[in-house]
Every structure is written in C-alpha cells, then in structure tokens.
Amino acid sequence: MKKLICFPCAGGNAKSFEKLIRGIHCFVICAEYSGHWSRYEEPLYHSMEDCIQYQMQELREKITLQDEIFLLGHSMGALIAFELGKNLLNAGYNVKGLYLLACMPPDEINDTDFNFEDDEEIKLFLKRINQMPGSVLNSDFFRENLLPSIRNDLRILKNFIGAYSSREAIDCNIVCMCAVQDPLVNEMCGWQRYSQRKIKEYYYQGNHFFFHEQENTEKIVELINLEISD
C-alpha cells in the first residue's frame, strides 16, 4: 500500500494539512507531536532526536515493510521527515520519496536565527513568517495552549541545527517546494548534497505557509499525485 506521512512545522499540528490531504490519492497519516493540540496533555519532546525516535516507534505500528512510503514535512517537519526517511531506509522500509516544504538543508540554517530572549521575540518571529495578527498572538488561548509547544520546538530546532554534522545522503526521490516571499527560505537547491538522486524544486507565490493558499494547494496535490502514481 502507498502511504503518505505528513509532519507539521514547529508548534504545528496535524490539522495544518487538512486542505492538502483531501485530494491525495493514497492513504495519508498526519503526525501529531506529543504535547501539541490533541495530545496537549502529553509531555513535550526534550530534543529532535527524542522526537524522531518517538515517531519511529509510532510509525512501526502503522506501516509495513511492504508499503511504499512517502514522507512530507513542512519547515521543521521537513527536517523530521528527512531524518526519519534515513532511519526507515536503514531499518528496511521502502521509502520512495520525500516532499520537503519551506525548509533549507540543515547546514544552511543559521541556529542564531532562533535565539529568542523572551516570548515577545517569538511573537515577532511568528508575525514575520506567518503575518499572524496581534489579536491572536496576544490572546490567552495562544499564550496558554500554543506558545509552550512553539517555544519548545524552536528550542529543540536550534539545538539540532547547532549540533548537526551529518553529510549522509538519502537514496530516494526528493521534491523541494517553497514560496518566493518566504522570509526564512531563499532557495532549496542545497538539498542536492543530501540526496543520491537528482532533486526537483518547485517555487510558489506566498509566505512560509504557502501551501495553505488554495491555488498552491491544488498545484501541490496534483504534483504529489503524479509523483506517487509513477
């Protein structure tokens, strides 16, 4: 069976892929990180390695060695998808492809971009990449329910990037997608260093969350369906 597994951004949740997965022509699994959204009462991850190990354990219950596996990740989720892809291949799973959205390769990300002195700086960062209104950022709901997981994810992302040294290239197809107005991602061609195959790159109009725009959603769904059907 063909299965697409989706990983959200820092502080994100499975619902962020709601529009995207409606038209996908295969079985879809949307990961929900511990301590996020529907799993709010569970403990947050201590590190990226902790997150990846936990995802591996969960996926073993949902996929088989006979399945054709495709991994999709947005922003931090793209890094998780890439690391999981390597781990799954090493464990004997049939990983066919990665769809990496809005994320440069780890050696091109500056960990100092995630040096936040306080929560106000995190809010400014979110407003810059997502144009999130102040009414949301300053709400009690955001402060109590969303900010803790965002703060933690940005911390583990910073630590992961700062310590990253691997140059292992994955042996599966990689499709990179990002938006030309994304303030965090200039280009994604650097992923070629991490692939044993020729990568594909696609650029769209929009910001860091470009795949939420209907026109982009339709194009991405069409692209993924074509890739999966090959």
Each language-model region and where it sits:
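Non-catalytic, mobile gating and regulatory segments of ester bond hydrolases
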Residues: 1-230
